Each structure stands twice: as C-alpha cells, then as structure tokens.
C-alpha cells in the first residue's frame, strides 16, 4: 500500500511537472509568436498583427528616442506653462553642459552603418501602405552643424522616400566627409551630382535646389511631391500626415505667393553681382520675360512632380530663371512667380483672390520678429520664446504648443545650441505619433 501511494504521488508529481513545462512552453511560444509578428523585416502593413496595440508597443519600445533631459514633453506640447518654465530653466543648465555631436562623432559611428541606424533610431520600414504608395522627394541644402542635419534626416526619413543632399562647396572638409558618411548608410539618400558654393541671398541658393531637382527626376523612385529644406528646418508633421496633406493638394502646389511691397520690388530693379558676397550695381534690369508679373514669397515650396519638370524643361520657365539670376534673393520671388504662371502645373491665377501668405501655405512655419505681438490685439502670433536671427525666431520650448496647432509640414528655425529641449520634445512627439497615431 505504501509503495502504491508513493507511485501515485510520483505519477501525480510527474503530471504536474509536465503540465507546468507545457504551460511554460506555451507562454514562451506565444511571446515568440508576438515578437515574430512584429518582426520589422517581414511586416504585413495591412495585417491585424501590425495594427495591434501589442505590436505598436514593441515597435515604440525599439524606436523610442532616448531622452537627454528629464523634461515634461507631454505637458510642453499641450502648452502647460509650468512644464515650459521648468524646461526653460533646464535649458539654461544644458547650455553649460551639453555640446553638440561633432563631425568626428559621425565619422566614427557610421563605420558600422547598421549599428549607427539602430543606435540613432532611424525608422527603416514603411509604417503604412498609404505611405509606401506615396513616396516624397526631399532637396536638403546644408552647410554646417552636422547634428542638425542628422536629426532632420532622421525626423523625415522613410525608406520609400528619396533624399538629395546638397552641401555647400565652401563647407569644411570634415563636415562634407561627415555628411557623406551618414548618407552612405542609406540607399535612398545621395549627394547632389553637382555642388556649388552658396552665397547668402544670391542665385546659388536656387541653383542648389535645381541641381537636386535634376537628380531626383532621374531617380527610379516614383515620388509625387518635392519638399526643400535647409539645416535649421524640422518637420512638425509625421510622414503619414504629410502624405495625407499632399494627397489633399490633388496636384496643386503650396507656397507663399503675394504682391511685392515697394521695398521688395527694388530687389529686381538693378542687377547684382556675386563674388564672395552679393553686391548691388547701377545697371538697371529689363522687365521680366513674357509680361509675367513678379510675386514674392520665401525659399520654401511644396511642389508637384509635374511642376518640377516644368521648372527644368519649359522654355518660359527657363527664361524667367535666366532673368532672376542677377537679382537679390531670387529664391524669394522665383518660386512665388512660377506658382502664378499660367503654364505651370498646379499653379494658381495671378488674380489678387489667389494671393497666399506663408501662414496659409503649408510649406514652412516661420515667426517673423516684425509680426510678433499680442494675439488678442490682432498679432498673428505671440513673441518668440527663443532668440532671433535675421529677424526670424529660433524657437524655444514656449513656442512648441503654438507650432503644433498649425497646418504646415515643417517649421523654421531650430538650433540645439539655442534650445535643445524644444527639439527633444518635438522629436518625442513625432515619434510617438508616427507609431501610435496619437499625440503624447
């Protein structure tokens, strides 16, 4: 009897042990299954698994950007003044402590591209089929501050998009090499085939974009729209939001285009010459070709592929391009004028009803010092919480809530040397929204 009881206990023990092992294996298999379903190398963008909360959590855990400072970004994006004040105070301390990443840092970290992309948390797969089917082209003109460039590229990067980078010929060699090292890690990012020395307010700024336009049109990527950026820009929309906004344009372009003031008209009254800087001459210019009225705007555009093709190929566009080459800051009236030219795809008539301000266009959100003031008294926006450079606000954390209320795709200017916290919070906001589709 004792032996029989012992055998029963032994059998019962083996049964419980086997059951426990089976349950453990089942849990491991379930976890492995969930992980496999969230494997970024074999994602089905339309599957329930990819859309599941569990999968999104796994993705966000792997792609969440590491916070450099303990600040309340959720509160800052909502306009919580206590969170803003704390971040501004924190920023004063950061200025004394944190130095931006150097050219050498990027030259070293990009020796192993996979490690670089993983460590810097680049999103290396499309986040939706809608984004996959609507590639965007970028013309990125840079000349300094390598960290600004890398963080901008990371923020706008998606593997289905295509990116042309133009580096100022005058930039230091170490900067050029660092840019080359970064873009060598991505098959869809390349250096412009022709580089020019960029002189402030001269034709060369336009030529840099034109060089990228030519290269991008030769790419096999079937991009739909072109956005141009500089080193102090940053997106304020996710790639998915950009795709939606561009689809809503339905082939139209979006850029500032207004009647010029008398002061602005002086920019194309006389010819300018370029050496190492732009110089005014006493030579008067002829009227613009084809009796085209000149409009004014800014350097930034959201342009359809057809618009870009006509910039480069249409004889009337080429005549206008030749005419503006010796004007002051031609990027601020060439695109604005082409946007009103009747032969340009996606343009609008030059009737006053079609004037469009920088606040109405979606290309770029900028705070101009001369327009800042009391919103309750009619000012378009409140004073800059950062500092000003050439009468333009370099944003601080106090501007972020306002920035995110606007419909623009990108904003200008940002500089981590001025306020790194606003960039950290914007990066965190965009990454969370890209993965979950919701705000912080």
Curated annotation (Swiss-Prot):
It comes from the Eukaryota. Pfam families: Branch (PF02485). Coiled coil: none annotated. It is found in: Golgi apparatus membrane. Disulfide bonds join 73-230, 164-384, 185-212, 393-425. It is an enzyme of class 2 (transferase). One of its GO terms (biological process) is protein glycosylation. Pathway: Protein modification; protein glycosylation. Its main location: Golgi. Its EC number is 2.4.1.102, 2.4.1.148, 2.4.1.150. Keywords: Disulfide bond, Glycoprotein, Glycosyltransferase, Golgi apparatus, Membrane, Signal-anchor, Transferase, Transmembrane, Transmembrane helix. Glycans are attached at residue 108. GO terms for molecular function: acetylgalactosaminyl-O-glycosyl-glycoprotein beta-1,6-N-acetylglucosaminyltransferase activity; beta-1,3-galactosyl-O-glycosyl-glycoprotein beta-1,6-N-acetylglucosaminyltransferase activity; N-acetyllactosaminide beta-1,6-N-acetylglucosaminyltransferase activity. Residues 1-12 are cytoplasmic. GO terms for cellular component: Golgi membrane. It is a single-pass type II membrane protein. It catalyses: a 3-O-[beta-D-galactosyl-(1->3)-N-acetyl-alpha-D-galactosaminyl]-L-seryl-[protein] + UDP-N-acetyl-alpha-D-glucosamine = 3-O-{beta-D-galactosyl-(1->3)-[N-acetyl-beta-D-glucosaminyl-(1->6)]-N-acetyl-alpha-D-galactosaminyl}-L-seryl-[protein] + UDP + H(+); a 3-O-[beta-D-galactosyl-(1->3)-N-acetyl-alpha-D-galactosaminyl]-L-threonyl-[protein] + UDP-N-acetyl-alpha-D-glucosamine = a 3-O-{beta-D-galactosyl-(1->3)-[N-acetyl-beta-D-glucosaminyl-(1->6)]-N-acetyl-alpha-D-galactosaminyl}-L-threonyl-[protein] + UDP + H(+); a beta-D-Gal-(1->4)-beta-D-GlcNAc-(1->3)-beta-D-Gal-(1->4)-beta-D-GlcNAc derivative + UDP-N-acetyl-alpha-D-glucosamine = a beta-D-Gal-(1->4)-beta-D-GlcNAc-(1->3)-[beta-D-GlcNAc-(1->6)]-beta-D-Gal-(1->4)-N-acetyl-beta-D-glucosaminyl derivative + UDP + H(+); 3-O-[N-acetyl-beta-D-glucosaminyl-(1->3)-N-acetyl-alpha-D-galactosaminyl]-L-seryl-[protein] + UDP-N-acetyl-alpha-D-glucosamine = 3-O-[N-acetyl-beta-D-glucosaminyl-(1->3)-[N-acetyl-beta-D-glucosaminyl-(1->6)]-N-acetyl-alpha-D-galactosaminyl]-L-seryl-[protein] + UDP + H(+). Residues 31-440 are lumenal. Glycosyltransferase that can synthesize all known mucin beta 6 N-acetylglucosaminides. Mediates core 2 and core 4 O-glycan branching, 2 important steps in mucin-type biosynthesis. Also has I-branching enzyme activity by converting linear into branched poly-N-acetyllactosaminoglycans, leading to introduce the blood group I antigen during embryonic development. Belongs to the glycosyltransferase 14 family. This is Beta-1,3-galactosyl-O-glycosyl-glycoprotein beta-1,6-N-acetylglucosaminyltransferase 3. It comes from Ovis aries. The gene is GCNT3.
